UniProtKB/Swiss-Prot annotation:
It comes from the Bacteria. GO terms for cellular component: Bam protein complex; cell outer membrane; membrane. Coiled coil: none annotated. This is Outer membrane protein assembly factor BamB. PROSITE patterns: PROKAR_LIPOPROTEIN. Residues 1-19 form the signal peptide. It is found in: Cell outer membrane. The lineage of its organism: Bacteria, Pseudomonadati, Pseudomonadota, Gammaproteobacteria, Enterobacterales.
Length: 392
């Protein structure tokens, strides 16, 4: 069982009472699979690398780079935000969102959700329940808004709204122009949950989001009204971990079908209009997944990389040689599936059969957030803050 969020400091969103058992026995402690031997069919190379502050260290974070108009935007947990030239990684501008604490020291901003770029703004959320909109031109703060709780997932911009899913189960819509809160929807919270929240996805005027209560919700964006809720995961089992029912992955909407994935299961297809379940498959994950054509690509809670059909979730192939290597979410790049791991490797996988086609050691601090593929570039940020541009 994948416990990446539980193994890092402070990752349960409630304090466990003494005497609670997280594990059944010592047998539940898993070992990382050894690095598989791969004969590279091509040689991935690092085009450039640039340091962006001190990164995230051993804290859970959803910070990853964003690319727009040939500029890469990246941040670290302390509050440093940089704009970099996408061709060579050279700095365009740099700002700090850390707050002054006395004459010489600064209080870290604890950035945690982002980066999102849209409409001339860079959006980032923080553990201090702040959402920032920076001007893409120079990094100045266009607006800053206090939200209902920690902003652990990336902001999502749609229809003039900035959608924020906070750690206490609130979905909030902010005005894109000035950050004013337009509406708030309570998604309910269980007594125990993983640290991290589902980023919403938008389609046909609705925001679709997963919740820590095991439900997927559709909300009318114009007024903030609940359209439907559907449970896809039940809190069952003999241990606290077995009973975690979080839906922390971002739903995907394709042709009127919502695909959603919960930590302890299930992978579920729902009708966008009604929320009715069309099919479900017993799979679980905290990693975002991909729907491409007639296939679903995902990394499950044990770090199996899988391809499934969108019609019924039938398994097409499974790659099991990366078990418990704490993989990132997958990304499609140049016809291959790419995942990073906690030891700083990138693994390139053939989408047709799941075989490895290349492997690259990139960074010694390791990866936690997924690579980003955009405009023909592959970007990834390591835990120490270094941003890499990879080519093949």
């Amino acid at each position: 069982m994948q416990l990446r969020k539980l193994l890092l400091p402070g990752l349960l969103s409630v304090t466990l009472l003494s005497g609670c058992s997280l594990f059944n026995s010592e047998e539940d402690v898993v070992k990382m699979s050894p690095l598989p031997t791969v004969e590279n069919q091509f040689t991935p190379t690092t085009a450039w690398s640039t340091s962006v502050g001190s990164g995230i260290g051993n804290f859970y974070s959803n910070l990853h780079p964003a690319l727009a108009d040939n500029v890469v935007y990246a941040a670290d947990r302390a509050g440093l935000v940089k704009a970099l030239n996408a061709d060579d990684g050279k700095e365009i501008w740099s700002v700090s969102l850390a707050e002054k604490d006395g004459w010489f020291s600064k209080e870290p901003a604890l950035l945690s959700g982002g980066v999102t770029v849209s409409g001339g703004h860079v959006y980032i959320g923080s553990e201090k329940a702040q959402v920032y909109a920076l001007n893409t031109s120079d990094g100045t703060v266009a607006w800053q808004t206090k939200v209902a709780g920690e902003a652990l997932s990336r902001p999502v911009v749609s229809d003039g709204l900035v959608l924020i899913h906070t750690s206490n189960g609130q979905l909030q819509a902010l005005n894109e122009a000035d950050g004013a809160v337009k509406w708030t929807v309570n998604l309910d919270m269980p007594s125990l949950s993983l640290r991290g929240e589902s980023a919403p996805t938008t389609a046909f005027g609705a925001a679709v989001v997963g919740g820590d209560n095991g439900r997927v919700s559709a909300v009318l964006m114009e007024q903030g009204q609940m359209i439907w809720q559907q449970r896809i995961s039940q809190a069952t089992g003999s241990t606290e971990i077995d009973r975690l029912s979080d839906v922390d992955t971002t739903p995907v909407v394709v042709n009127g079908v919502v695909f959603a994935l919960a930590y302890n299961g299930n992978l579920t297809a729902l009708d966008l209009r009604s929320g009715q379940i069309m099919w479900k498959r017993e799979l679980g994950s905290v990693n975002d997944f991909i729907v491409d054509g007639n296939r679903i690509y995902l990394v499950d809670q044990n770090d199996r990389v899988m391809a499934l059909t969108i019609d019924g979730g039938v398994t097409l192939w499974t790659q099991s040689d990366l078990l418990h290597r704490l993989l990132t979410s997958p990304v499609l790049y140049n016809g291959n599936l790419v995942v990073g791991d906690s030891e700083g490797y990138l693994h390139w996988i053939n989408v047709e059969d799941g075989r490895f086609v290349a492997q690259q050691k990139v960074d010694s601090s390791g990866f936690q957030t997924e690579p980003v593929a955009a405009d023909g570039k592959l970007l990834i940020q390591a835990k120490d803050g270094t941003v890499y541009s990879i080519t093949r």
